[in-house]
């Protein structure tokens, strides 16, 4: 699952509560760089607010 805020897709991350995706209204997406992302894609982490 993923949540969306401002049109950005967020992947699961340890910053999520209970490892679940936050409701869209509470999803805060932040772009993060993954040095070891072999796909070279931008990753987004999701944090509950």
Swiss-Prot record:
The keyword Disulfide bond applies. The presence of a 'disulfide through disulfide knot' structurally defines this protein as a knottin. Potent and selective blocker of N-type voltage-gated calcium channels (Cav2.2/CACNA1B). Also blocks vertebrate Cav2.1/CACNA1A (P/Q-type) and Cav1.2/CACNA1C (L-type) channels at very high concentration (2 micromolar). The keyword Secreted applies. Its main location: secreted. GO terms for molecular function: calcium channel regulator activity; toxin activity. Expressed by the venom gland. It comes from the Eukaryota. This is Omega-segestritoxin-Sf1a. It is found in: Secreted. Negative results: this toxin does not inhibit sodium and potassium channels. GO terms for cellular component: extracellular region. Keywords: Calcium channel impairing toxin, Disulfide bond, Ion channel impairing toxin, Knottin, Neurotoxin, Secreted, Toxin, Voltage-gated calcium channel impairing toxin. Disulfide bonds join 3-22, 10-27, 21-48, 29-46.
